Amino acid sequence: MSVLSWLLDLLYPPKCVLCRKLLTGKGPVCPHCMDKLPEFDGAAPSVRFTSGGAVSFFYEGQLRESFLRFKFGGSAFYAQTYGAWMAHTIRDRLAGKYDVLTWAPVSRARKRKRGYDQSALLCREIGTQLRLEPIQTLRKIKDPPAQSTLADAAQRRANVSGAYLSLIHISEP
């Protein structure tokens, strides 16, 4: 451990990314929370317009609260933990089944407000873990209402319709 890391840990002791209690051991999650993570171990979900997907954990409880802190609460450093978990899931469940690593970007206004694009941070961390360079394939050209304000999948699809511009051309083989 470097002197700088030691000083930072002294001034800002590391906390569990889920419950935010002080960590006594190594890793970003305390043993209590690690045992209670809502791990998804079922079948691969069906993802429209793709040949499949993978889920690391159910989006509920402390994990959901933690992810909302990452997304809206200035906890950009959580990307390391979430990215590592997602990369592990990709290696486990999607090895050899993907062609590109990309993300759906937030609007400039949301990026300015938050200070970062959480999707891009996650994608870069996953890329680091998988030794795969992410490729930006989309640009957000409209800033519709937040998806979280909408009630169902149909409203969410309609909300993002026309919001993104493709930066690449994909041709059929």
Language-model-derived ranges and their functions:
Residues 1-171:
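Glycine-rich phosphate/pyrophosphate-handling loop used in enzymes and phosphotransfer proteins
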